[in-house]
């Protein structure tokens, strides 16, 4: 079975899409917010998606890994908070009204903290041929690629529909 984990699942849309479209996946969806997990559970049930839900702090993964997140995963996906606090004034009002601030914003002093924690987790828990898929703030793509390289990952950057560097695909570098 293909083991997949979605960090910062929110409403569960990514985890649900993967659970419904991959062949025999074992999908785990992680979020710190009990309210987000309740919404994700309801959405998964309504859409007949088999998913294990875990309440955990992405930033504490490496200090205390829950049993359901032990072992290796073939795919890690995450759309973590990535908007710097200083960008808040440029946000559309409808986004600010409908999304919790904790799901959107990161401190200007450490905008890549979630990515760093997930990459550190992946060093141990991503299978050798596994892949990490991130959504990222275009302002921080180069820094993310540097962090990935320092931890032994290659990073391919992909554009969104507006031509912005928005997605990063990381793979462990081969040891050859």
Predicted regions and their residues:
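Mobile active-site "lid"/loop adjacent to the S-adenosyl-L-methionine
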Residues: 82-113
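Flexible, glycine-/basic-rich loop-and-beta segments that form/coincide
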Residues: 173-176
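Conserved Class I SAM-dependent methyltransferase catalytic core
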Residues: 108-170
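Conserved SAM/SAH cofactor-binding pocket of Class I
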Residues: 1-88
């Amino acid at each position: 079975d293909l083991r997949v984990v979605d960090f910062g699942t929110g409403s569960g849309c990514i985890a649900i899409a993967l659970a419904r479209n991959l062949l025999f996946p074992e999908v785990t969806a992680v979020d710190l917010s009990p309210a987000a997990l309740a919404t994700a559970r309801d959405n998964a049930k309504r859409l007949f998606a088999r998913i294990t839900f875990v309440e955990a702090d992405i930033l504490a993964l490496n200090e205390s890994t829950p049993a359901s997140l032990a072992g290796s995963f073939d795919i890690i996906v995450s759309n973590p908070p990535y908007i710097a606090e200083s960008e808040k004034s440029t946000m559309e009002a409808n986004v600010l009204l409908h999304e919790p601030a904790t799901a959107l914003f990161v401190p200007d002093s450490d905008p890549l903290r979630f990515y760093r924690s997930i990459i550190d987790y992946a060093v141990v828990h991503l299978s050798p041929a596994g892949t990490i898929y991130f959504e990222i703030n275009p302002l921080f793509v180069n820094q993310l690629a540097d962090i990935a390289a320092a931890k032994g990952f290659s990073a391919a950057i992909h554009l969104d529909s507006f031509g912005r560097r928005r997605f990063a695909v990381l793979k462990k570098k081969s040891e050859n």
